[in-house]
Amino acid sequence: MNFSKLKFGATIGIIGGGQLGKMMAQSAQKMGYKVIVLDPNEDCPCRYVAHQFIHANYDDEQALNQLGENSDVVTYEFENISSEQLKKLTQLYHIPQGYQAIELLQDRLTEKQTLLEANTQIVPFVQIQTNQDLLKAIEKLGFPFIVKTRFGGYDGKGQILVRNDSELDEAYQLVEKQECVAEQYLDIQKEVSLTVTIGNEQQTTYFPLQENEHQNQILFKTVVPARSDKENEARKEVEKITRAIHFVGTFTVEFFIDKENNLYVNEIAPRPHNSGHYSIEACDYSQFDTHILAITGQKLPQAIELLKPTVMMNLLGRDLDLLENEFSRHPDWHIHIYGKKERKPDRKMGHMTLLTDDVNQTEQYMLMKFEGRDK
């Protein structure tokens, strides 16, 4: 794809005003662009950094058209917009990301089928439409396996681990509500991710391989560079994926590494990703900078420079009181508070990034300060 470069002062429309939209807007503004954001939440984080705010639901066709008509280019911060709605918008307005990635990836079944056809390494899976299919999953996958809903399921929601026959009842209940996918359970050594930006004329820029740790299905911390020898292999898997799915802008591929050191593609996020937030301080370009460069038709940097090894930790609602007490003592902590009005114990309220010469020591220090987060 080749499209004209946007001039300074042009307007970028963003569908979604959460923290990703906010950080996109901040990158866009420092490059001289104006920003309009559409979000159903009146107090969304992006509202207070955007030049214009449209308060509307994501399926409000009139509001989406208003966004398109007032923007020179439109992007989105998340994958749960209707692909049909997005397809209509792409026929009327300039949306470089298109709708294909959303159409394929918001459904776990079509995502896995696409990855399989692209010849990437994925764990065995079974489509689950009925309770009878769960019995087939036992035959094909064996215990344990994970049942996931085909749609939705952000931050681990809509997932059930089935370890034996006695745990099938909860899976049956989930399948009765909606179609699912069952995946073979992996004995995981490590989780890693690779953030990538594809720009004008399919120029590709890779960020360093990121090592991720989750707690209660929510990303806890990211270490960069990943302590793994799988970066080149991960890039080769991404190349297969980009031949199968149209991308423009920043996206992230999540991987599992099992105890035998085999790399498996887990899932794809077709937009900037939580594990790439460290890049704001730790790289010469952030994942949001390269996203804006891509969708505005600008040339991407040939390579991303990691300025220093880094640990990034998500800040949840339960962390904020401690953070307020400690912040003034730690000028080396790069703090981002997203501006969400309602504080919940397990809600992502911000993140902090520490550049360090000793990643292991920094990890231990953060765990000590935020005691209980490693439980």
From Swiss-Prot:
The keyword Nucleotide-binding applies. Keywords: ATP-binding, Ligase, Nucleotide-binding, Purine biosynthesis. GO terms for biological process: 'de novo' IMP biosynthetic process. GO terms for molecular function: 5-(carboxyamino)imidazole ribonucleotide synthase activity; ATP binding; metal ion binding; phosphoribosylaminoimidazole carboxylase activity. The keyword Membrane does not apply. One of its GO terms (cellular component) is cytosol. It catalyses: 5-amino-1-(5-phospho-beta-D-ribosyl)imidazole + hydrogencarbonate + ATP = 5-carboxyamino-1-(5-phospho-D-ribosyl)imidazole + ADP + phosphate + 2 H(+). ATP binds at residues 108, 148, 153-159, 183-186, 191, 214, 266-267. It is an enzyme of class 6 (ligase). Pathway: Purine metabolism; IMP biosynthesis via de novo pathway; 5-amino-1-(5-phospho-D-ribosyl)imidazole-4-carboxylate from 5-amino-1-(5-phospho-D-ribosyl)imidazole (N5-CAIR route): step 1/2. Its EC number is 6.3.4.18. SUPFAM superfamilies: Glutathione synthetase ATP-binding domain-like, PreATP-grasp domain, Rudiment single hybrid motif. Belongs to the PurK/PurT family. Homodimer. This is N5-carboxyaminoimidazole ribonucleotide synthase. It comes from Staphylococcus epidermidis (strain ATCC 12228 / FDA PCI 1200). The lineage of its organism: Bacteria, Bacillati, Bacillota, Bacilli, Bacillales.
